[in-house]
């Protein structure tokens, strides 16, 4: 089965607002869908992403120089190396930069 990973800095204010139709489209085509983003819900248990098979809570920060982004890079790189995604769909400036760096040697 083919696998797609959507990467953005946050879930509630980005993934949920813009990418649900694309997650559904990939699932309808038989793909396994995954999302990597920080859970920005006030109550973390409210984070339920429709049409997402696997969710990775990555500690992205919106400011690129924050130390948490180093941890986010390491976590995302481990996920990409382990899961072998066919497509990595990058969004938001910091999330996209970290995803591209994490996937650089994988491609």
Positions of PLM-derived features:
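Alpha-helical elements of Rossmann-like donor-binding domains used by nucleotide-donor carbohydrate transfer enzymes
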Residues: 21, 71-78, 98
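Active-site proximal beta-strand in glycosyltransferases
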Residues: 3-5, 104-107
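Structural motif
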Residues: 3, 86-87
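N-terminal strand-loop element at the rim of the active site
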Residues: 5-68
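Short His-centered aromatic/hydrophobic patch
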Residues: 90-96
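Glycine-rich phosphate-binding loop signature in dinucleotide/nucleotide-binding domains
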Residues: 79-86
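Short beta-strand scaffold positions
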Residues: 6, 89-90
């Amino acid at each position: 089965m083919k696998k797609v990973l959507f990467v953005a800095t946050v879930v509630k204010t980005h993934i949920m607002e813009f990418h649900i139709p694309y997650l559904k489209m990939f699932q309808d085509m038989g793909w396994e869908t995954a999302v990597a983003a920080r859970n920005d819900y006030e109550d973390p248990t409210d984070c339920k992403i429709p049409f997402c098979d696997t969710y990775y809570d990555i500690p992205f920060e919106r400011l690129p120089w924050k130390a948490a982004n180093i941890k986010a890079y390491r976590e995302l790189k481990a996920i990409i190396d382990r899961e072998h995604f066919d497509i990595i769909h990058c969004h938001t400036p910091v999330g996209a930069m970290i995803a591209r760096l994490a996937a650089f040697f994988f491609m």
